[in-house]
């Protein structure tokens, strides 16, 4: 049963309470809930209890599990064994080993924070995230920092941002008389999209192996035109994978809830129940890792790239974000009468102001080479950041701005017209799937995040920008003689000054680009365009003032993101050249030679050879074009090495190299459409996308 296996591999609260002495358990809870310092004596007791629990489950090793700036997790395994006299060993795990580790920091991305010869780095236990057993190893969630204390990971800043929004939200809540609230946390439920393909097909595609996406591939006769895959019947192999995945996730305490087919062929989605943001980030990393591992067991490969196939939808990760108090109140819950809910309206305005003032940071938080293929491609939100509030909330805000009466709307009963079907109330607002940042009930759904990315960066930005607006609100209201009057003016002024960010229309419509420009909204189409704003003074001041990033830490992340962008495209370009020179051109050239021989033989016999003659001419022309296109790409890659700095190099890849790759792909894909299947060196889109039955 699910209840028997759920969290069975997690040293969770129930396990701690059962295994720890009462005073130790209370001390640990004070650390987790209030951020109190953990005494080494307490850590030693906790470490020993964890070790005993893990050994009972067959564990021999432990690891400090952390999230460097690579976007994936890292771990180094150490055994529990310790030598004793007589050549024997005992199993030990000390408080110091629990609290602190020392991996090599020089081999991870640091953005200049560490030189290659400066190898010392530290991992430190994140007591707010439960330890778990994975692949027979006790995993201890940790943060990762340099010898000088600079954050080298994704989690440290996330935890700092959670503290920032907690501090500022508590200030605002106290003004409303919420004396019983002691902490505020953000919660997240990230919907994870992915593709599953047959491993035999995957193994024959160099591009999938090296880059995670197809760099060549002519469109299959059928794609997603019929909308028959979305929510369609799940195929047996996929269903078996999903069942296996759910069980593995449940054992690790991941609240896997929903599974279904997505829009594109071979595309699927898994959505979890909400949990505290840093735990959600850990769980999402585990989810992506387990998706890959479980797929292998079923003869499948899980593709998490944002755009693995051209011509069909790519994959995203919808980041459902909300703010809640420790008393169980969702601060983004409108309630039955949102127009009378001043606390809700104030927090809503903080989010509106944050999104408007920091459009650039939200775009930066989702910027990657892979996600650039997806954003603005009529399958995902545009690269322009805007907010969807729906008609009800928009009308309320308009009434407040104009100081006009708002009578409210009674909830409408939806009648379908069949007497045997139940009646139910229509939601206050429809869903807008084209909006990057949309209200969906009592949360915001940020849809720009790419499927392969960690959710840590995005939520670090979200938490920090909202914390900043709450700080400004608290500063103003705390000193107000007339609190209600000042709050009314603040809400009204915020709506007036920031309503440009609200757009309830079709984000896919070309006219929105022009309208957004008229409104003064940013349209940062590519990763380099977005990263050009990362170190703007207002952004540096924001993170430094809330102690989320130092200027050096932010600069390092800018450098890592910029370098990663160029490195990814370089790998893709080199892979294209390898496939072109070594596989495509030899295969098509050989076939053209054979075709020419057949053409000459037919002509010698006086037979009609129109097909052979036309195809030979067409393939010869395409071969020549492919040869030239590959040569240009190769030369431009060589020339790119002379770029003076990381920004210039990224610009070369954004324009010249990506254009070269597009030109080469067009020619090669055209060759595929007229080449026999047994000649073409790679499985086709049709074979890959429809190969799992």
Where are these regions (language model features)?
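Flexible inter-domain linker/hinge segments
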Residues: 1-14, 167, 171-174, 391
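Gly-rich Lys/Arg/Thr-decorated short loops/hinges at beta-loop-alpha junctions or inter-strand turns
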Residues: 1-12, 32-33, 150, 221-230
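Histidine/acidic residue-rich metal-binding segments in metalloenzymes
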Residues: 6-95, 99-115
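Active-site proximal loops enriched in glycine and acidic residues that flank catalytic Cys/His/Asp
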Residues: 42, 66, 94, 272-274, ...
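Active-site-proximal loop/turn and secondary-structure-junction residues that shape catalytic pockets
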Residues: 42-46, 66-68, 96-97, 144, ...
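Short linear, low-complexity motifs centered on an aromatic residue
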Residues: 71-86, 106, 111, 205, ...
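Glycine-rich, acidic/polar active-site loops that bind/position phosphate-bearing ligands
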Residues: 118-304, 313-316, 323-559
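C-terminal amphipathic alpha-helical interaction region
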Residues: 491-693
């Amino acid at each position: 049963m699910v209840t028997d296996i759920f969290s069975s591999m997690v040293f969770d609260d129930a396990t701690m309470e059962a295994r720890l002495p009462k005073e130790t358990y209370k001390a640990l809870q004070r650390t987790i809930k209030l951020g109190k310092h953990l005494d080494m004596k307490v850590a030693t007791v906790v470490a020993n209890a964890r070790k005993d629990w893990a050994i009972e489950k067959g564990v021999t090793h432990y690891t400090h599990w952390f999230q460097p700036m690579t976007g994936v997790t890292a771990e180094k395994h150490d055994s529990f064994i310790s030598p004793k006299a007589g050549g024997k060993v005992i199993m030990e795990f000390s408080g110091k080993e629990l609290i602190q580790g020392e991996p090599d920091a020089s081999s991870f991305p640091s953005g200049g924070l560490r030189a290659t010869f400066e190898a010392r780095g530290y991992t430190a236990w994140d007591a707010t995230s439960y330890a778990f057993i994975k692949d027979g190893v006790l995993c201890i969630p940790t943060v990762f920092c340099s010898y000088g204390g600079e954050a080298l990971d994704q989690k440290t800043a996330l935890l700092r941002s959670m503290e920032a929004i907690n501090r500022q939200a508590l200030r605002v809540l106290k003004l409303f008389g919420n004396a019983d609230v002691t902490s505020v946390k953000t919660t997240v439920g990230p919907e994870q999209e992915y593709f599953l393909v047959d491993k035999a097909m995957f193994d024959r595609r160099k591009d999938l192996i090296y880059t995670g996406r197809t760099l060549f591939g002519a469109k299959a006769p059928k794609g997603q035109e019929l909308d028959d895959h979305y929510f369609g019947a799940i195929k047996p192999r996929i269903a078996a994978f999903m069942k296996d995945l759910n069980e593995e996730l449940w054992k690790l305490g991941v609240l896997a809830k929903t599974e279904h087919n997505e829009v594109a062929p071979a595309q699927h989605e898994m959505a979890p129940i909400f949990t505290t943001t840093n735990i959600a980030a850990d769980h999402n990393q585990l989810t992506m890792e387990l998706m890959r591992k479980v797929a292998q067991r079923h003869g499948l490969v899980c593709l998490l790239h944002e755009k693995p196939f051209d011509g069909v939808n790519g994959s995203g990760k919808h980041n459902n974000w909300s703010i809640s108090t420790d008393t169980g109140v969702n601060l983004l819950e409108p309630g039955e009468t949102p127009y009378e809910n001043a606390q809700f309206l104030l927090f809503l305005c903080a989010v509106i102001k944050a999104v408007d003032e920091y459009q650039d940071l939200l775009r930066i938080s989702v910027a990657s080479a892979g996600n650039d293929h997806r954003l603005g491609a009529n399958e995902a939100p545009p690269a322009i950041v805007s907010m969807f509030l729906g008609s009800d909330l928009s009308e309320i805000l308009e009434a407040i701005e104009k100081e006009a009466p708002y009578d409210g709307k009674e909830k409408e009963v939806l009648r379908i017209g069949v007497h045997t079907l139940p009646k139910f109330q229509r939601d206050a607002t429809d869903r807008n799937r084209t909006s990057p940042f949309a209200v969906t009930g009592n949360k915001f759904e940020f849809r720009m995040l790419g499927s392969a990315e960690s959710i840590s960066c995005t939520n670090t930005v979200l938490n920090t920008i909202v914390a900043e607006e709450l700080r400004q609100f608290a500063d103003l209201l705390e000193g107000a003689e007339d609190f209600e009057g000042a709050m009314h003016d603040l809400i009204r002024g915020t709506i007036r000054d920031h309503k440009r960010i609200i757009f309830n229309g079709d984000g896919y419509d070309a006219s929105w680009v022009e309208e957004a420009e008229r409104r003064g909204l940013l349209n940062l189409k590519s990763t380099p365009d977005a990263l050009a704003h990362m170190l703007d003074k207002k952004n540096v001041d924001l993170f430094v003032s809330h102690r989320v990033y130092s200027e050096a830490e932010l600069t390092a992340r800018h450098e890592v993101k910029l370098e990663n962008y160029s490195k990814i495209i370089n790998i893709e370009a080199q892979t294209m050249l390898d496939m072109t020179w070594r596989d495509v051109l030899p295969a098509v050239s050989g076939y053209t030679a054979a075709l020419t021989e057949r053409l000459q033989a037919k002509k010698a016999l006086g037979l009609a050879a129109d097909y052979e003659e036309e195809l030979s001419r067409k393939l010869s022309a395409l071969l020549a074009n492919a040869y030239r296109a590959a040569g240009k790409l190769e030369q431009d890659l060589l020339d790119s090495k002379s770029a003076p700095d990381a920004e210039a190099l990224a610009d070369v890849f954004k324009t010249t190299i990506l254009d070269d790759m597009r030109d080469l792909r067009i020619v090669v894909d055209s060759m595929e459409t007229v080449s026999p299947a047994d000649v073409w060196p790679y499985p086709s889109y049709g074979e890959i996308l429809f190969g799992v039955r």
